[in-house]
Curated annotation (Swiss-Prot):
Its EC number is 2.8.1.-. Keywords: Transferase. The gene is ytwF. One of its GO terms (molecular function) is transferase activity. Residues 17-100 form the Rhodanese domain. The active site is at residue 65. The keyword Lipid biosynthesis does not apply. It holds the Pfam family Rhodanese. It comes from Bacillus subtilis (strain 168). This is Putative sulfurtransferase YtwF.
Length: 103
């Protein structure tokens, strides 16, 4: 199954256009402490299996990590469970928009 991907530029456009977006950052606590996209929700990759029951299979979720590898693995896993997923190409390393420290 081919996983959909979005560039950081296209993601930034969606955020700036105030489009409805379900963005999940799957990095570790110490990584998001350095800054995350303000519109993102933080769910560590290791917590995804137990948290997936809180996700809605009718919604499309966009996943981001540091480089795009972990988020791709999360996308593949959730895709197999019947979720609609999109991976952010290049992850936070490619992101040039605003970030904020996680509270």
């Amino acid at each position: 199954m081919e996983i959909k991907e979005i560039s950081t530029a296209a993601l930034k456009e969606k955020i700036e256009a105030d489009e409805e977006l379900y963005l999940i950052d799957v990095r570790e606590d110490e990584e998001v402490a350095e800054g995350m996209i303000p519109q993102a929700v933080h769910i560590r990759m290791g917590d995804i299996p137990e948290k997936m029951e809180t996700l809605d299979k009718d919604k499309e979720y966009v996943f981001i990590c540091r480089s795009g590898m972990r988020s791709m693995n999360v996308c593949k896993y959730l895709d197999e469970q019947g979720f609609k997923t999109v991976n952010v190409e290049g992850g936070m390393m490619a992101w040039e928009g605003e970030t904020k420290p996680k509270n």
